[in-house]
Regions:
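Membrane-embedded translocation segments of transport machinery
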Residues: 2-7, 167-327, 331, 345, ...
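Inter-helical loop and helix-membrane interface segments of multi-pass membrane transporters/permeases
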Residues: 4-5, 33-37, 70-89, 102-161, ...
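Membrane-water interface regions at transmembrane-helix termini and the short interhelical loops
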Residues: 33-37, 63, 78-79, 85-94, ...
């Protein structure tokens, strides 16, 4: 089947795919895990996994997309008709993620506007974030702004929308992160006890491997953290890379392009740690690190406030960079939904953008209301306390994505065979230097690791085998 939409070339694909991979998780989760898991030790483990596990999953999704020229919904059926159900499972992931990603994008938009109008100090006050997300109107307004931007890019299409904006946004994101990272290294602060901490010391905390108290169990936990971060970072097992792969022209060197995506994604994750860990260490010490929204919307505003006047500028630049990362990722999620719906309903991009936009709006409003009129709290199987947004995130990220990767590894590794993917990577005579490694990973390593990750991330492992 010939796709009517495509990227103009390798660079357009790499920037768009990197934009999808580089999301808020790179910026608010990677630095936290690095600080928690021994600094340089985590970095080393993560790098090894990128070169083995990461490239295997990324290569699989992109190659399936380009060879079948289909979106995820139909691509798996092309490999084997009995596996069509896997396409529907994959379609569920962006369907769920789209319900809440624009809500998070709205939070980022709110904070960016605060710093833009020099009101950033208010964000550093205790209780500000909770007060904002529980407000009945404000989160919906900022979500609408972010969702409108996302829908516009997708509406413009692959080459004139996603590729065009990625060519500007991704270099801009990289420059902003590099700028803040360099600034973080120059920081110095003396606390009330007279202790002075510097950005260079924070940098050493970041990159120096900490083997204190290292046991086999702790190393396995570090490896599992790195694996989960890598898995969620690369946008695999949600149909995005299959969809983007279907837009890649046949003359593009897939192996080279995938390597570039890996480098860009890993580089941004490293720079995010370099941007955040020294700054948080200088003003809050090692106890100031937190994960996710707590780091981004509570800890960092306190850091920016402690910087004084320059903190307002740095805060605006930081949330602009985070907004870029969120936008490119949300665009890829929405594009996957639109592309699949165009296949299902045989309608135009314009019509499906409108339909998916309405769906995203309605569900995002419900997610916003989950912090006020629809508020509830329950305990997930992995032990975490959850509201409505957390439930959607758990089902999509902790349950469906590892499960889909497990099934994909069985399909490719044992049903159609790794040679099916390798042939696509080498179709133009390009050398696939890691072909043997790919085969071993896809047949033996990925299925086992994904089963472990699935049981661990869902909390089902503790329920089945007992223990903590």
């Amino acid at each position: 089947m010939k796709k009517s939409s495509s990227f103009s070339g390798s660079l357009g694909f790499v920037l768009a795919a990197a934009g999808s991979a580089v999301g808020v998780g790179n910026i608010w989760r990677f630095p936290y895990l690095c600080a928690k898991d021994g600094g340089g030790l985590f970095l080393l483990v993560y790098l090894v996994l990128v070169l083995t596990f990461g490239f295997t999953l990324l290569t699989t999704d992109v190659a399936i997309g380009r060879r079948t020229k289909q979106n995820a919904l139909n691509a798996f059926a092309t490999l084997n008709k009995k596996w069509k159900f896997l396409g529907y499972l994959t379609f569920l992931v962006p369907t769920l993620i789209m319900t809440y990603y624009s809500v998070i994008g709205g939070w980022i938009t709110k904070y960016f506007t605060l710093y833009l109008v020099s009101s950033g100090d208010a964000a550093a006050q205790d209780g500000f974030f909770t007060s904002f997300i529980t407000s009945p109107v404000s989160p919906i307004v900022f979500m609408l702004i972010f969702l409108a931007l996302t829908a516009w890019v997708v509406y413009c299409g692959v080459e004139k929308g996603i590729e065009k904006y990625s060519r500007y946004i991704m270099p801009g994101l990289l420059l902003l992160i590099i700028g803040i990272a360099i600034f973080s290294l120059t920081l110095s602060y003396t606390d009330e006890s007279g202790m002075t901490r510097t950005g260079i010391e924070g940098f050493l905390v970041y990159i120096k491997p900490d083997f204190t108290g290292l046991t086999v169990q702790r190393f396995l936990n570090i490896a599992l953290d790195a694996m989960s971060q890598l898995f969620f970072s690369l946008s695999v097992s949600m149909g995005i890379m299959i969809t983007y792969g279907s837009y890649v022209k046949d003359d593009v060197d897939l192996n080279k392009a995938n390597n570039q995506i890996e480098i860009f994604d890993t580089g941004v994750a490293f720079l995010a740690g370099l941007m955040i860990i020294p700054a948080v260490y200088v003003f809050l010490g090692t106890d100031g690190m937190a994960s996710g929204p707590s780091l981004t919307f509570i800890s960092l505003p306190k850091v920016f406030a402690a910087m004084g006047g320059v903190g307002r500028v740095i805060g605006a630049v930081f949330f602009l960079a985070l907004g870029f990362a969120a936008l490119t990722s949300c665009v890829s999620v929405m594009e996957t939904l639109v592309a699949n719906c165009m296949e299902i309903f045989r309608k135009s991009r314009k019509e499906m953008c409108a339909a998916v936009g309405v769906y995203s709006l309605v569900t995002a409003v419900l997610i916003c209301m989950g912090y006020n009129v629809l508020y509830f709290e329950l305990t997930l199987p992995n032990g975490s306390a959850a509201q409505l947004l957390d439930v959607m995130d758990y089902i999509s990220n902790s349950f469906l994505m590892p499960f889909i990767s497990l099934l994909t590894s069985i399909l490719v590794g044992w049903v159609v065979g790794p040679k099916w993917i390798i042939a696509e990577v080498e179709k133009n005579g390009e050398h696939f230097g890691r072909a043997k490694l790919y085969s071993v990973m896809m047949k033996y390593v990925v299925p086992v690791v994904m089963l472990i990750l699935f049981l661990t991330s869902t909390g089902l492992g503790s329920l089945i085998f007992g223990g903590r």
